[in-house]
Curated annotation (Swiss-Prot):
Membrane topology: Single-pass membrane protein
Pfam families given in the database record: MtrB
Database matches in InterPro entries: MtrB_MeTrfase (IPR008690)
Family affiliation: Belongs to the MtrB family.
Protein name as annotated: Tetrahydromethanopterin S-methyltransferase subunit B
Gene from which this protein is expressed: mtrB
Top class in the EC scheme: translocase
Organism lineage: Archaea, Methanobacteriati, Methanobacteriota, Stenosarchaea group, Methanomicrobia
Organism of origin: Methanosarcina mazei (strain ATCC BAA-159 / DSM 3647 / Goe1 / Go1 / JCM 11833 / OCM 88)
Amino acid sequence: MSIVRIAPEINLVMDTESGTVTQERKDSIQYSMEPVFERVDKLDAIADDLVNSLSPSKPLLNTWPGRENTSYIAGIYSNSFYGIIVGLAFSGLLALIIYITRLMGGVV
């Protein structure tokens, strides 16, 4: 917040952000909110990054350009891998059960 003293002898000042002209008072204190706004903007960017981390198609704050769908593609590959492993295990178990039932065909 910057203030321009128009007439120091009669304590007349102007606020440059709003353009208002007023009398300067000794009993009021004015603080600049710019450092607070900078920190709030930084926290807002971090909060947006946290929300974007939940979506695989959104870019993260500290990633290289062009890596928006990396999580999505990695999810497809890992789920495909685990699907193949579970499918092969199920098929092997089914083949083992069929083999054992054929061996025991005359016993039961």
